[in-house]
Amino acid sequence: MVGGRRLGKRGSPLLRWSVKQESFSHGFSKSDLQALSSICDAIMPPVPLESLNLEMKLKVLRNDALLSFFKSSSSESHVRPDEVAELLATKAIPLTVLVVRIVLRILTFRLGTLLLCGLVCLDKKHWPFLLKFSEMSLEKREKVLQRWNTQWYNPLARIGFMMIKAIFLFYYFTWTNENSENPVWDAINYSVEIGENEDMEQKERPLDEGIIETAKEDEMTIKQRMINKGLKVTEDRERDTYKIECDAVVVGSGCGGGVAAAILAKSGLRVVVIEKGNYFAPRDYSALEGPSMFELFESNSLMMTHDGRFRFMAGSTVGGGSVVNWAASLKTPDAIIEEWSVHRGISIYSSEKYKAAMGIVCKRLGVTEKIIREGFQNQILRKGCEKLGLDVTIVPRNSTEKHYCGSCSYGCPTGEKRGTDSTWLVDAVNNNAVILTQCKAEKLILADNDANKREESGRRKRCLGVAASLSHQTRKKLQINAKVTIVACGSLKTPGLLASSGLKNSNISRGLHIHPIMMAWGYFPEKNSELEGAAHEGEIVTSLHYVHPMDSTTPNITLETPAIGPGTFAALTPWVSGSDMKERMAKYARTAHIFAMVRDEGVGEVKGDIVKYRLTKADEENLTIGLKQALRILVAAGAAEVGTYRSDGQRMKCDGIKQKDLEAFLDTVNAPPGVVSMSKHWTQSFTAHQIGCCRMGATEKEGAIDGKGESWEAEDLYVCDASVLPTALGVNPMITVQSTAYCISNRIAELMKKRKKD
């Protein structure tokens, strides 16, 4: 609802679910779909009221929507197997799709079912005494899923089940009809609310003056559109390529690329920004979790570490991560600045210019610590900390003090959060920069440096621009020739572009830090009237608590609250049984989360869609320390029940609990491995910060780029995103990334001015 009105068709069609499809391209057979449907029915079966405890039974009987929710099965719901299969086939990482295909195909055969399910598929009464999975009773299918959930020696079934469960439940709780309605939202007390903003319905979007949305163009119009924006364009018909001449090309439009584009355009350079995502303004955001996460996030928000332990949340739209982040605007800690400047010898952090840059960035983003009203989860974090005598810190944010938007992770529909799309990129466009959307950088254009240049710069190569591809609407390629090239694709994509272009530095793709997190949850029944609201309401991060390990003076662990819509909640929640799943969802709106985020020592490596990452022993210990502290805070705040995201549904009732019982429970808490592990218990979490992979180094051996942001291998090639940061920093990195980009791009601007004079 919006101000008492239904959302209806608000927002871009790309950020709403499409109407029911009649044809599909998923490639699953009818038998595969039958097996898929049978799994989904066992995940969300009808639940008899007599199986519920008294408290839940009374709650269900008082609420018609909840009663209908408990009585229904997935096959009777708004979700069709074809649609779940289509999402799996088109959105998930190919390797996981292959696993799902294999599992479903095996289950279409009787012997295959015996292989994956064991003797539970035997039927002594009917020939041939073996049942296919779809022929088994609902109770037996549920038992099979419970086994798969714990069987480390059957990784194929466990991974396949995890993926089907995640996609199915995510779609089940995020699906909407053409009026943005979902029949189960009333049951779980969820609604999509958007505050009013007088600028929300403005006709012209902030970047319209400089943006070219290539998906809306064809081969006949795209060239003229670029010329109309003032670009010098020629056509190479033999290569089916348009050649563009400019001073600077920026690949990526997020926290790093947006700042670089603004600074370089302001200095008088002709700047072209290319972005593989689409452009949306506040009026375009639907606040709908499902389609927004698939459209606005890298790899549809389904990219994971190799062990399935962490999902990556990285922006893939004009504005990048600043569009989908949670507005936390924390400056680089002094201890980190000292480490990078003194111990690692990175010159950019050793001067007062960097600290001044942080002030300039915060001013441009309108960062404030003022807040009129805290949301449900932050109230709980604050209350729990105060009860325990712990320090709680107000989080600076790049939003207004009255901002109360719980859906900023899907793009801020009120426009009160100031991402690069409404700040730095506006500055760039106002200084004649051009932004091309749905434009993907394929390769950097590198040439051998001549002998004099090589001796002068010490670099064997020179970057001359970028080769890029456009949207599916045209086969034309782009060759963007530039005097300077800035890569800002983020830590997950920048390494691949550099490596595929022929750069060989050993630090490229390595040294990834992810600020890993583990979440704790606490259920606060409605009778607790002191804590108002619901988990999905209010600004996402307004309070935090720093946990200090006994042997450290630098906070390596931070406790914050996340954005977690019903789809994400359902996808991540451990599945113990169909009844338990429905009970957890019935409590969704009053289930608060606190996560522990660690400044990790462990490092990873990015190779395409595969991210290899391992925590160190110290990281594991810090996550466990943070998770236990989060649980203590939730209990102190008055939770009736608390738990973790361990696959067995680890939890504890809190009413009347004694301290010794709490400590006994906490002794069982740890940071479990991922689904691929050889462990009975596993977990899945997410990470919103990806750092490193092209880090700065004082020497070529220590980093992929130098202390001024330039590649050690290729002259006139710079990197301006989170991948340049030398280590993890332990706090939300937006201000650090933008301030680093500010310093790098100002140096580039000065260098270009000097060249012009020479």
From Swiss-Prot:
Keywords, comma-separated and alphabetical: FAD, Flavoprotein, Membrane, Oxidoreductase, Transmembrane, Transmembrane helix
Cellular component terms per the entry's GO annotation: membrane
UniProt topology in membrane: Multi-pass membrane protein
Subcellular location as annotated: Membrane
Any Pfam family matching the protein: NAD_binding_8
Transmembrane segments: 102-122, 155-175
Positions with a binding annotation for FAD: 246-261
Keyword RNA-binding: no
Active-site residues annotated for this sequence: 689 (proton acceptor)
InterPro entries xref list: FAD/NAD-bd_sf, GMC_OxRdtase_N, GMC_OxRtase_C, Long_Oxdase
Keyword DNA repair: no
Molecular function GO labels: flavin adenine dinucleotide binding; long-chain-alcohol oxidase activity
EC number: 1.1.3.20
Catalytic activities: a long-chain primary fatty alcohol + O2 = a long-chain fatty aldehyde + H2O2
Entry function: Long-chain fatty alcohol oxidase involved in the omega-oxidation pathway of lipid degradation.
Family: Belongs to the GMC oxidoreductase family.
Name of this protein: Long-chain-alcohol oxidase FAO1
Organism the protein comes from: Arabidopsis thaliana (Mouse-ear cress)
Lineage of the species this protein comes from: Eukaryota, Viridiplantae, Streptophyta, Embryophyta, Tracheophyta
